[in-house]
From Swiss-Prot:
Gene3D superfamilies: K Homology domain, type 1
Species name: Eremothecium gossypii (strain ATCC 10895 / CBS 109.51 / FGSC 9923 / NRRL Y-1056)
Assigned keywords, A-Z: Cytoplasm, Nucleus, Ribosome biogenesis, RNA-binding
A GO term from the CC aspect: cytoplasm
Homology family: Belongs to the PNO1 family.
A single GO BP: ribosome biogenesis
Name listed for the protein in its UniProt record: Pre-rRNA-processing protein PNO1
Summary of the function given for this chain in its UniProt record: Required for small ribosomal subunit (SSU) synthesis. Has a role in the processing of early nucleolar and late cytoplasmic pre-RNA species.
Biased composition annotated in UniProt, kind: Low complexity: 48-62
GO molecular function: RNA binding
Pfam family, one: KH_PNO1_2nd
Amino acid sequence: MVAPTALKKSGTDGQTAPGPTGSRIVGTDNTRSIEDDDDILIDQEDSGAAAAEQAEGAREQQGVVLDAEGKPRFAAAASVAETRVKAESRKVPVPPHRMTPLRNSWTKIYPPLVDHLKLQVRMNLKTKSVELRTHPRHTTDPGALQKGADFIKAFTLGFDLDDSISLLRLDDLYIETFEIKDVKTLHGDHLSRAIGRIAGKDGKTKFAIENATRTRIVLADSKIHILGGFTHIRMAREAVVSLILGSPPGKVYGNLRTVASRLKERY
């Protein structure tokens, strides 16, 4: 007779009822005998070596090779022959009084844009604007669209074609625009006399300022556009401002001679 305090044997199927600390996942044998633990040995050095081998294998697959000092060796970067430029477009409005010069000079305007900057360009007569667009395959300069827009803008402001093309060849040229009223508030005949003082007889004063400061000046009513380098624009602006404020032309010419001598010494 079995003692009432003896442990009951498990069923014939060999399964054990899950205890309070057993796994709650059904269908797997989560019990392990104590003898199995003798076969499981964890060595820190072995695990470190295995991890190092795995890391080295992964680096070799990724193309990373370490030298004797442990520094990575990278393959030389492949030279990129062409830079991809995303497709962009720009519209440059053309004033009505510049449409006729634009049509007459169109055969000389679009070749620098198409051949040099690799842009797509067309004249839209309906909207009275020049449309520029980059091509992802042919355009290589990221700043080509801005250069083309500046070139067309300079021509629409009244600059000659050769002076406008210089914006494409040189990177240190700028255009500055200001009005006479920004310097001094003038109306009526006083404004007309100020414009005449800047231009001079037959444009001699304007040409003298341009030659002395190596700039190009356009007088468009009360607006003044100056094309040139940063320092040259500042010198030309000072001469124009002096004429607007009422300085005698002789004094302005003397200052221009001083400016011209300084530029010769600098360059």
